[in-house]
UniProtKB/Swiss-Prot annotation:
This is Leucine--tRNA ligase. GO terms for biological process: leucyl-tRNA aminoacylation. Belongs to the class-I aminoacyl-tRNA synthetase family. GO terms for cellular component: cytosol. It is an enzyme of class 6 (ligase). It comes from Bartonella henselae (strain ATCC 49882 / DSM 28221 / CCUG 30454 / Houston 1).
Length: 880
């Protein structure tokens, strides 16, 4: 293909140029990864999108970041894999089917077509030949193969679990979909039901998943902490408490003569004032059978919030039973047993003892039910008679008090001493306690009572039980002839689809009608991208070459579930020989959101397109375009349709071009922080685009025939030094994801070049050669961020190659060495002036130069120097 540049005499037209270069890249297959390429491999991946209908600015920022990394690494000589796909199963497609009378498949693939076109408009350097959607039969066929592999490996379990059941929608709801006890969509009161569900045994990997976090040095510390807390390893004791009843002939107490509590703080046992059991504890269930009031209390608790966060923030409620627990260190002390709404059955044993003086939850409960609050930990340095628990519990360290044989010990020492004593005591012929390790992480329930998901390849036979679909009979394909006129899962009603012969005995059987959680789909897609057409789920040779993903990019909202499940999947696949790594993602970057001002009139939210903003008396005021009525300018918030502060990327690209959008969205804020979208910011970015083009258009007739070269002396040498220093700094910025810093340097660089380019015909030949090299550097540096403009300028300078295929320029380190630098000088912490020193100056030389400064000498007349604090290349502080 002949590469032609745009007419130099015209204003840069991004729409025409961007379409042209995208067509050239497609025709030349510039970004199609060649597996056999022996160069060092680099895999960059952004979390793939859900095809909701249209991309938003959050997508643009996410994929622009990944594209900068991909283009930069490609220029640095790596064989880059940068794929794209679609996380396509899920509830929104079923909602659309019900609301719009359209099949989920039709809705999904229509959205994919639209969003693919939008992403291509951005000029992403994606290998589209590897594209797939998780709803493609080819993809979920391989996912079913993985399920069977997991099943054979013992990593799949089928067991009864308590779920949130929406009686109107007739489906299970995730905890997050229960709002104030009601279904998020139907508004129906949610019921707690026990259903038989399919689980992946992620808990088998708890210790390994926790230990692996230490190796993820290129992950944000915040994400690692969140996963560590979610896995929730704790070391404690299982303590057996003898039970007694306050009522004679208590049949329940005869059946339950003891209860086991898990505690990480046995050192606080002498401060215990109650035992609390989960509403789902077997003892609570037994007591409720004979107590209607307790039965009502339990049902009321179950209708409230179900998430851990909701239980922690909800008002603490308890029901006092007829039972008391005998204190393990003092049989004369009996403490009441409650059924409480804040105790979780799926953590520990579903029973805890409460020490109100040293735990906020226990303190709140004790205050509500007028229970004793006995302090047993005294803060260090505080007299015992001066210490009391009044308004809040004491949560810190110290020494033990009011604790018999533990007095005077630290809590850590008391833990060991209490454990030793309890392990030596006997209750009903067994030690009263044993040390144990517990994890918060529970097995992953993957069953969903929905149609639009990957079918679980299992068959229910009345004779053989539950048996797997033979691998040769896969895939189990979703039927197309379903309707959504009634709530619930249409697969349950599809007799033709679910009726099947048992693969073991041949008798009549039924298919499993649950489908897999959509998090399963995204737990292994990164491995599939390495060989998307392999017959097996993944190709071991390909995964060995490409995994782990060197750089993964996405929102921090996926810090726990998606990222944890992907880590589990990689370990599981390694155990089956599919991959050779433990971790899927070597580097992780979590970008901030795109936010925008909100606008509101007396009735509703108003979109940015409906208003104009003017300055009045130094203040910004907003007015409706239709009737000039005043609009309130609200807070800056995440873009959302509900608040109408969404900006459509298509509109901005149509007005300014993709490069302007990419440049602005990466320039205005550090990438880990939120970026505030402003029209003025976009206009500023577009002015820069036009300025770059003007500089090239003016200088191209001269520079296209100039051989680039480093300046040898004078102004030409100084320009070359600036060019090489900028190249060196921008390279470092891109390695560190500091895109905004790189862009700031490029603004400065153009400011230095522009005056020289504007009078290019009048400069010396040496300067022309230095300018040509500087411009080549500049275009190479903007190319990852504004690829279309860089290509157009590169062609305008007479080049017949694609800048997207060029190597990154080589920096001459000798030209980057600063000969001198300037330091701010403080006297007693207040800046008084500056000092310029040689780049090689020692601290002694810096001190000598500072003492020779006139403004320093003036202060030395009154006071001598006590010390001088020198932070090299940062600051000097003279302390008098």
């Amino acid at each position: 293909m002949t590469i032609e540049h745009y007419n130099l005499g015209e204003r840069y037209n991004p729409r025409a140029c961007e379409r042209k270069w995208q067509a050239i890249w497609d025709e030349k297959k510039t970004f199609q990864t060649v597996q056999e390429d022996r160069r060092e491999k680099y895999y960059v991946l952004e979390m793939f999108p859900y095809p909701s209908g249209r991309i938003h600015m959050g997508h643009v920022r996410n994929y622009a970041m990944g594209d900068v990394v991909a283009r930069y690494k490609r220029a640095k000589g790596f064989n880059v894999l940068h794929p794209m796909g679609w996380d396509a199963f899920g509830m929104p497609a079923e909602n659309a089917a019900m609301q719009n009378k359209v099949h989920p498949k039709t809705w999904t693939y229509q959205n994919i077509a639209v969003m693919r076109g939008q992403l291509k408009q951005l000029g992403l350097s994606v290998d589209w030949s590897r594209e797939f959607a998780t709803c493609d039969v080819d993809y979920y066929h391989r996912q079913q193969m993985l399920f069977l592999d997991f099943y054979q490996k013992g990593l799949v379990a089928r067991k009864v679990a308590k779920v949130n059941w929406d009686p109107v929608d007739q489906t299970v709801l995730a905890n997050e979909q229960v709002v104030d006890g009601r279904g998020w969509r139907s508004g129906a009161l949610v019921e707690q039901r026990e259903l038989t569900q399919w689980f992946f045994k992620i808990s088998d990997f708890s210790e390994d998943l926790l230990a692996g976090l230490e190796e993820l040095e290129q992950w944000p510390e915040k994400v690692r902490i969140m996963q560590k807390n979610w896995i929730g390893k704790s070391q404690g004791l299982l303590i057996r408490w003898a039970l007694k009843s306050t009522e004679e002939a208590d049949e329940v107490c005869k059946s339950f003569d003891e209860v086991v509590c898990y505690s990480t703080r046995p050192d606080t046992l002498f401060g215990a004032s109650f035992l609390a059991l989960s509403v789902d504890h077997p003892l609570a269930q037994a007591l409720a059978q004979k107590d209607k009031a307790l039965e009502f209390f339990i049902e009321n608790c179950r209708s409230g919030g179900t998430t851990t966060a909701e239980l922690e923030t909800a008002e603490k409620q308890g029901f006092r039973t007829s039972l008391v627990a005998v204190h393990p260190f003092d049989v004369a002390v009996h403490i009441p047993v409650y059924i409480a709404n804040f105790v979780l059955m799926d953590y520990g044993t579903g029973a805890v003892f409460g020490c109100p003086a040293h735990d906020q939850r226990d303190f709140d409960f004790a205050r509500k039910y007028d229970l004793p609050v006995q302090p047993v930990v005294l803060p260090s340095g505080v007299e015992r008679e001066d210490f009391a628990i009044t308004e809040t519990p004491y949560l810190g360290d110290g020494v033990m008090i009011n604790s018999s044989f533990l007095d005077g010990l630290t809590p850590q020492q008391a833990f060991e001493e209490a454990a030793k004593r309890l392990e030596g005591q006997m209750l009903n012929g067994k030690p009263q306690a044993e040390k144990t390790v517990q994890f918060r992480l529970r097995d992953w329930g993957i069953s969903r009572q929905r149609y639009w998901g990957c079918p679980i390849p299992m068959i229910h036979c009345t004779s053989c039980g539950v048996v797997p679909v033979p691998r040769a009979d896969l895939p189990v394909v979703l039927p197309d002839d379903v309707t959504f006129e009634q709530p619930g899962n249409p697969l349950v009603c599809h007799e033709t689809w679910k009726s099947v012969a048992c693969p073991v005995c041949g008798q009549f059987a039924k298919r499993e009608t649950d489908t897999m959680d959509t998090f399963v789909d995204s737990s292994w897609y990164y491995a599939r991208f390495t060989a998307p057409f392999a017959q097996e789920p993944v190709d071991k040779k390909a995964t060995t070459e490409w995994l782990p993903v060197q750089q993964y990019i996405g929102g921090i909202e996926h810090a726990i579930l998606h990222l944890l499940y992907a880590r589990f999947f990689t370990r599981a696949m390694k155990s089956m020989g599919y991959v050779t790594v433990d971790e899927p993602f070597k580097g992780l970057f979590t970008q901030g959101m795109v936010v925008h001002e909100t606008y509101r009139d007396e009735k509703d939210w108003v979109s940015p397109e409906e208003i104009s903003i003017v300055e009045k008396d130094g203040k910004r005021q907003a007015y409706k375009l239709t009737d000039q009525s005043e609009v309130t300018i609200g807070s800056i918030e995440k873009m959302s349709k509900s608040k109408k502060n969404v900006v459509d990327p298509d509109d901005i690209i149509a007005s300014y071009g993709a490069d302007t959008v990419r440049w602005f969205i990466l320039s205005d804020s550090p990438p880990e922080r939120d970026v505030i979208w402003t029209e003025s910011g976009v206009e500023g970015a577009h002015r820069f685009v036009q300025r770059v083009w003007r500089c090239v258009a003016l200088s191209a007739p001269v520079l296209r025939d100039v051989v680039p070269c480093v300046g040898k002396q004078g102004a030409a040498l100084q320009l070359s030094k600036v060019a090489h220093r900028t190249l060196y700094a921008v390279e470092d910025d891109l390695e560190k994801f500091a895109f905004n810093r790189a862009i700031a340097r490029l603004y400065e660089f153009l400011n230095i070049m522009a005056p020289l380019l504007n009078r290019i015909e009048n400069v010396e030949d040496e300067m022309k050669a230095a300018l040509r090299q500087a411009m080549d550097f500049f275009l190479a540096m903007i190319a990852p961020i504004m690829p279309h403009l860089a290509e157009e300028c590169h062609a305008a300078l007479g080049e017949k190659t694609l800048i997207s295929e060029l190597a990154w320029p080589v920096c001459d380190r000798a030209l980057t060495v600063e000969e001198c630098y300037t330091l701010p000088v403080q006297i007693n912490g207040k800046k008084r002036g500056e000092v310029t020193v040689a780049a090689t100056a020692s601290e002694a030389m810096i001190e000598e130069a500072v003492l020779a400064l006139d403004f320093v000498k003036v202060h030395l007349v009154k006071k001598p120097v006590k010390k001088m604090i020198i932070v090299p290349k940062r600051i000097v502080n003279v302390v008098l």
